[in-house]
Regions:
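Aromatic sugar-binding surface patches on proteins
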Residues: 146-167, 258-273
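Proline/serine/threonine-rich low-complexity linkers at boundaries of modular beta-sandwich domains
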Residues: 57-79, 195-203
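Gram-negative bacterial Sec-dependent N-terminal signal peptides
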Residues: 1-23
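Extended low-complexity, serine/threonine- and proline-enriched intrinsically disordered segments
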Residues: 103-141, 234-249, 286-291
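Conserved, compact domain cores that house catalytic/ligand-binding motifs in diverse enzymes
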Residues: 213-265
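Contiguous beta-strand segments within globular domains
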Residues: 74-124, 157-159, 214-223, 233
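Short beta-strand elements
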Residues: 186-215, 293-340
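Short glycine/proline/serine/threonine-rich loop/turn segments at secondary-structure transition edges
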Residues: 151-153, 166-179, 272-284
């Protein structure tokens, strides 16, 4: 099993080191600040980064569905907003799709232009599911009657559901984008159209639900057992939290796996836990396995509250900074430019 750590989600954008001369030329203070930030980031490895307890779980936050909103002609209200219950589904999953119509906010209105006529309901809402080859998968009828997945009758949120069929599933280990075109029409034939979508994902490996933890070289390692159907490259990511539910660290690992059962490690760098001042037991609050052989990646589900560790003491973990050479070198070069 080949293993290579990859950059964490939270810090990925920070690892594109800006041109040294550009930063230094802006202001000496900015260059000095950037150098200080690089030295702070260098305390931790790229595969394990601290997470502020005040922030949302980064894995769960990354899976939040995006709301797409489209007004009528010339910006006429009401605007149609559409979204899904998740950003990815697999064969057999029930996908829920939502739509609502609301007047535009003051910030979205051009006060210098004549106000277009606002259309009135009631509205009939339908959705067309189309795959990335343009093939229609289904036509859906949305409802606002409190039935079949609609949470509350008459609340203005229309709901449709669809069970992902095996007949249209992607090959195992791959995924494809599915678009949904949502149309709302009233009795006057006023129409609102908005586009949403999701990922139809068929991962090549699955988390089994088995985990084990150990202390290794001053860091906490949680191993996850996975069952692999097809050989390929896989990304495992997880968030470690305190017993009180505060996020502490995000860890990622990239591995090439052959078919069969394997244990894959997530290493949470010990200095993060030492500096947090929090002892165990810790919780693997979220974890997900992604098949990364082709684009788009085949996302697996995010499993929450996956594992509780032994009651490690925070003083058992290393107090030594990781000292990332690339970031320390960048900081040194910035500091040299500031002194010129």
């Amino acid at each position: 099993m080949k293993s290579k750590h990859i950059k964490p989600l939270l810090a990925a954008s920070l690892f594109s080191l800006a041109p040294m001369a550009t930063i230094a030329a802006a202001t000496p203070d900015l260059a000095a600040q950037a150098a200080a930030e690089y030295r702070t980031m260098a305390r931790y490895p790229e595969w394990s980064q601290p997470v502020s307890g005040a922030l949302a779980d980064p894995l769960l936050a990354g899976r939040e569905a995006t709301v797409q909103t489209q007004a009528g002609p010339a910006g006429a209200g009401p605007a149609l907003s559409v979204w899904a219950s998740d950003i990815r589904y697999s064969t057999g999953d029930t996908a829920y799709f939502y739509a609502s119509l609301a007047e535009r906010t003051a910030s979205s209105v051009n006060l210098l232009a004549p106000a277009p006529r606002s259309a009135a309901g009631p509205w009939a809402v339908t959705g067309e599911l189309v795959d990335n080859n343009g093939q229609q998968l289904a036509m859906l009828s949305y409802r606002d009657d409190g039935k079949d997945g609609d949470q509350q009758a008459g609340d203005g949120v229309y709901t449709a559901s669809y069970v992902l069929p095996a007949t249209h599933q992607p090959d195992i280990g791959s995924a494809k984008n599915i678009a949904i075109k949502v149309t709302a029409v009233n009795a006057d034939q006023d129409q609102r159209v908005a586009l949403g979508g999701f990922l139809y994902s068929q991962p090549g490996a699955q988390l089994t639900g088995e985990y084990r933890d150990r202390l290794s070289e001053g860091s906490l390692v949680i191993a996850a057992k996975v069952d692999v159907a097809v050989a390929g490259r896989y990304h495992l990511a997880g968030v470690l939290a305190s017993a009180l539910g505060e996020s502490l660290s995000l860890s990622q690992n990239a591995v090439h796996l052959e078919p069969g059962s394997h244990w894959v490690d997530l290493s949470f760098y010990g200095l993060i836990l030492r500096e947090a001042g929090v002892s165990g037991p810790y919780t693997l609050s979220s974890v997900t396995l992604t098949t990364a052989g082709a684009m788009p990646n085949a996302l697996g589900p995010v499993v929450t509250a996956a594992h509780v560790t032994k009651p490690y003491l925070n003083v058992q973990f290393t107090d030594k900074p990781f000292a990332r050479a690339d970031l320390l070198d960048a900081a040194t070069r910035l500091e040299g430019l500031v002194k010129r």
